[in-house]
Design a protein with these regions (language model features):
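Short, solvent-exposed loop/turn segments at secondary-structure junctions
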Residues: 13-15, 36-39, 81-82, 114, ...
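Active-site donor-binding loop signature of nucleotide-sugar glycosyltransferases
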Residues: 34, 67, 78-81, 90, ...
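Radical SAM [4Fe-4S] cluster-binding motif and immediate context
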Residues: 86-190
């Protein structure tokens, strides 16, 4: 790590063992917990308001963060989960997508998992939250229009809802452009 740099990390794995991670890696200044669409935004707002002064950011105690302040571990209140995933904007412009044609794009049509496997972090959510079928179809249209080579759905269990799965797979087959491929994680016993 560069001594004159500030480090902020996040993500599902980091969100569940915060204090341990911060103790093991003292070069990390902040650990963002929860969904990045909210936690990251809160961090950047706090940083802007504090003039990017690390101590001022910590003193402001922004939500969904873990850090050490004066040698004491601090974990602020976590922001609630995003209930309506359709509120999250599509992350790309058409031009950006066209520039990613030969890349693999990871896409999330749902969050969570219907199972409660003790070894898996996805069991922490306890329920599945979804982007609406209409929203996913609109996003698929964007991928097809840009001729993205491969879209990997990172949904923990894409086929947890048979009707939804049928609707989306039928749509993909109907709109097939002969270029874009789709990848899904499914459970065979559903």
């Amino acid at each position: 790590a560069l001594a004159d740099q500030s480090y902020c990390i996040g993500g599902p794995e980091a969100s569940e063992s915060c204090e341990k991670l911060l103790r093991e890696y003292p070069s990390i200044d902040f650990l963002l917990r929860g969904e990045g669409e909210k936690a990251d935004l809160l961090f950047f707002e706090a940083a802007e308001n504090a003039g990017c002064d690390l101590e001022k950011i910590k003193e402001a105690k922004p939500l969904s963060m873990s850090y050490f302040l004066n040698g004491k571990y601090v974990e602020t209140e976590r922001v609630p989960l995003i209930e309506n995933l359709d509120d999250i904007p599509f992350p790309y412009t058409h031009e950006e997508l066209c520039g990613l044609k030969e890349r693999i794009l990871y896409y999330e049509g749902s969050r969570g998992c219907p199972f409660s496997c003790s070894y898996c972090m996805s069991s922490l959510d306890k329920k599945v939250r979804v982007f609406s079928v209409e929203r996913v179809k609109k996003d698929i249209d964007e991928f097809l229009s840009a001729e993205v080579r491969l879209v990997k759905f990172v949904d923990r269990t894409f086929n947890f809802d048979k009707k939804r799965t049928y609707d989306l797979l039928s749509y993909i087959m109907e709109k097939d452009n002969g270029i874009t491929e789709f990848h899904f994680e499914i459970s065979l016993w559903l």
